[in-house]
Amino acid sequence: MALDNHKFGDYSPYLYKTTNGGVKWKSITNGLPKNTLVWRLVQDHINPNLLFLATEYGVYVSLDQGDKWHKFSTGLPTISVRDMAIQKRENDLVLATFGRSFYILDDYSALRAISEESLEKEGILFQPRTALQYEPLIGGTSSQGASFFTSKNPEYGALIRFYIKDAFTSSKEKRLKREGLLKDGNVPFPGWTALDNEMLETTNEAVVVIRNSEGQIVDQLTKPL
C-alpha cells in the first residue's frame, strides 16, 4: 500500500505491506531516499516477490517484496511517475508521468529470474523468448499523409538479454559524478586534454558467442557495455 502526506508538507515515503490480511503491517522503504514521494505500487502477476514503485523521482524495483528497493530508471528521465499498469499478455510495464507523456518498458519478464543473491554474480544470461521468423513488410502511409503515425517496430530476430555486475564506467561519467558531489557548485574546468581523452576513449564491449547443439559457433554478437 502506497500513501502520501505531501499536502501537509510531508514528502516522506509511506509504503506498507501485510501478509495476514491487514492484521499487521510492515514498512517497506529500505533503499528509498528521504523525501521520495510515492505514488503507485504494483506487483507482478507471476512472481509475487517482484514489485514496481512509481515515485516523484522515477521508478524503483524490488526483488524481495519490498525488503530492498533499487532505482530502475535507466533510459527514463528523473520525472514524476504518477501511475503504472502491467500489460499481462506482453509483460510490459506502462508508466504515466506528470507532463512527460507515457513510457513503456517492453517485456520485463527477465526480472522474474533475478534475486538479491543473483545480483552478486559476475554475470547472468537470461532465457530468451521464443523468436518468430517472418518476412518484414515495408508499409506506406496510404492517403493519410502526416496524420498517419506508427512507432518503430522492435528489431528483427531473437532478443538476448544479459546482466553484468561491474559495468564499464567512462572517464566522463566518473568526472560528472565527482562534480555532482561538489556542495558549493563551483565546478573546475577539467582541461582540454582531459576532455579530448574523454572523446577518444573507447568503451568496453560484451561478446556473446552463440553455438548450436554440436558446439559449433553460428553467430557472435558484440555490444557496448
Task: Briefly describe each language-model feature range.
Residues Q65, N212-Q216:
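Short, glycine-anchored, charge-dense loop/turn motifs used at functional sites
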Residues E135-E205:
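Contiguous beta-strand segments within globular domains
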Residues I217-L225:
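Glycine-centered tight-turn motifs at strand-turn-strand junctions
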Residues V207-R211:
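Beta-strand signatures of extracellular beta-sandwich domains
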Residues M1-F148, E155-Y156, K165-A167:
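Beta-propeller blade termini and top-face loops
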